[in-house]
Regions:
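Extended, small-residue-rich solenoid/repeat segments and analogous flexible loops
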Residues: 1-4, 17, 101
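Small/polar residue-rich beta-strand/coil "junction" motifs that cap repeat-based extracellular fibers
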Residues: 9-15, 21, 26-28, 35-43, ...
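Alpha-helical heptad-repeat coiled-coil segments that mediate oligomerization/polymerization in large
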Residues: 18, 32, 60, 74, ...
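Beta-stranded membrane pore/translocator domains
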Residues: 255, 263, 269-373
Length: 373
C-alpha cells in the first residue's frame, strides 16, 4: 500500500511513500521525503527540500539534489547526477554520463566513466579522471592527479600539484611540471617540455623546447634536436647592442651543442689586431733593413769589381805612353775601368786609373808610380 503524509503529498505505487508538503512518490517502493521532493521510478528515493530522483533505483539526498537515470545518485545540497549509475556526492557536485562520478564540493564529471574527485575538480571526457582539489582533466582518457593539476587533450596525464599537460598523450609528472605538445614528456619536479615529443628525460628543473628536444642533465635548457636550425633576427638590432654593457665574449659550442662563452671577446680581438698590425709594421721595417743590407752587400761586391777594373799591367820599357781598359766582375756585380801610364825615364813610370760600377754607379780611381832598376 502507498502512503502520503503532508499537504498535497502524493504516493503512487505499491509501497510508495511521500512525506512532506507537495511531496510526490511515483513507482513501486518509491520514497519522497521533503517539501516538493519528487521520486519517480521503482525504488527511487528523494530526500530533501525540492530533491528530485528520476529513474529506477535513483537517489537524490539533499536540498535541491537531482538524480536522473537508473541508479543515479546525487548526495548533497544541489548535487546533480545524470545518467545510468551516475554518482554525484558533495555540495553542488555534478556527474553527467553513465557511470560518471563526482565527489567533492562543486566537483564536476562529464562523460562516460568520467571521475572528478575533490573540491572543484573537473573531469570532462570519456574515461577522464581529475583527482585533487581544483584538478582539471579535459579530453578522452585524460587524467589529472594533484591539487591544481591540469590535463588537456586525449590521453594527456598531469601528476603532481600544479602539474600541467596540454596535448594528445602529453605527460607532466612532478610538482610544477609542464608538458605542452603531442607526446611531450615533462617527468620531474619543475620540468618543462614544449613541442611534439619534447622530453625532459626525468631531469628536475630541466626545459626541453622544440620537436624531439631531449634533456641530458638537470637544470638544463635544451633547444631542438640535431636537425634543428636556429634564427634570432633581433640579435643584430641596435636595441640588442644597446642592451649590452661591459665586456662582451664569444659564444662557443662543443659537439653536443653545449653552449658557453669564451674567455676572450671582440675587445681582445681588436687588441690582438692592433698587435698584429704593429708586428706587421715591425716586419716591414725588418724587411726594409734586410733590403738595405742586401743593397749594401751588393755595393760592396760592386766595389770589389771596381777595384779589379782599376788594375792593368805595366807598360814595357820600350814604350813611352800606354792606355788600357778592363772589365771587372765580382759575385755578379760588374765594373768598367781605364788606366793611363807614362814613362818618365827608363826607371820611373807614372799611372792613373778610373773605374765605374755598372749597377749602382760606384766610382773608384787611383794614381801611382813605379820605380824599377
Amino acid at each position: 500500500n502507498s502512503n502520503a503524509a503532508g499537504q498535497f503529498a502524493t504516493a503512487t505505487g505499491a509501497g510508495s511513500i511521500a512525506v512532506g508538503e507537495s511531496a510526490t512518490a511515483t513507482g513501486r517502493a518509491s520514497n519522497a521525503a521533503g517539501t516538493y521532493a519528487t521520486a519517480t521510478g521503482a525504488d527511487s528515493m528523494a530526500s530533501g527540500e525540492e530533491a528530485t530522483a528520476t529513474g529506477q533505483g535513483s537517489q537524490a539526498i539533499g536540498d535541491k539534489a537531482t538524480a536522473t537515470g537508473r541508479r543515479a545518485n546525487a548526495t548533497g545540497e544541489k548535487a546533480t547526477a545524470t545518467g545510468w549509475n551516475a554518482n554525484a556526492i558533495g555540495e553542488e557536485a555534478t556527474a553527467t554520463g553513465s557511470n560518471s562520478q563526482a565527489e567533492g564540493r562543486r566537483a564536476t564529471a562529464t562523460g562516460q566513466f568520467a571521475r572528478a574527485l575533490g573540491g572543484n575538480a573537473t573531469a570532462t571526457g570519456q574515461f577522464s579522471t581529475a583527482s585533487g582539489e581544483n584538478a582539471t582533466a579535459l579530453g578522452q582518457q585524460s587524467a589529472a592527479y594533484g591539487e591544481y593539476a591540469t590535463a588537456v587533450g586525449q590521453g594527456s596525464v598531469a601528476t603532481g600539484a600544479t602539474a600541467s599537460a596540454f596535448g594528445q598523450n602529453a605527460n607532466a609528472t612532478g610538482v610544477g611540471a609542464t608538458a605542452l605538445g603531442q607526446n611531450a614528456q615533462a617527468t620531474a619536479n619543475n620540468a618543462t617540455a614544449v613541442g611534439a615529443g619534447a622530453n625532459t628525460a626525468g631531469y628536475a628543473n630541466a626545459t626541453a623546447i622544440g620537436a624531439g628536444a631531449t634533456n641530458t642533465a638537470a637544470n638544463q635548457m635544451m633547444f631542438g634536436g640535431v636537425t634543428t636550425t636556429y634564427a634570432a633576427p633581433g640579435i643584430t638590432s641596435a636595441a640588442s647592442h644597446a642592451a649590452q654593457s661591459g665586456p662582451t665574449n664569444f659564444v662557443t659550442s662543443d659537439g653536443g651543442g653545449h653552449l658557453a662563452t669564451s674567455n676572450y671577446g671582440p675587445d681582445n680581438i681588436a687588441g690582438l689586431s692592433g698587435a698584429v698590425n704593429s708586428l706587421g709594421m715591425n716586419v716591414a721595417s725588418i724587411w726594409q733593413s734586410v733590403g738595405n743590407l742586401q743593397r749594401s752587400v751588393r755595393r760592396g761586391y760592386e766595389g770589389s769589381a771596381v777595384a779589379i777594373a782599376n788594375t792593368a799591367p805595366t807598360i814595357s820599357r820600350d814604350a813611352r805612353f800606354g792606355v788600357s781598359a778592363k772589365w771587372g766582375n765580382f759575385r755578379g756585380e760588374n765594373a768598367f775601368g781605364a788606366m793611363a801610364q807614362f814613362r818618365v825615364n827608363p826607371n820611373v813610370v807614372l799611372n792613373g786609373s778610373l773605374a765605374v760600377g755598372m749597377r749602382y754607379g760606384g766610382v773608384g780611381g787611383g794614381v801611382g808610380g813605379l820605380y824599377e832598376w
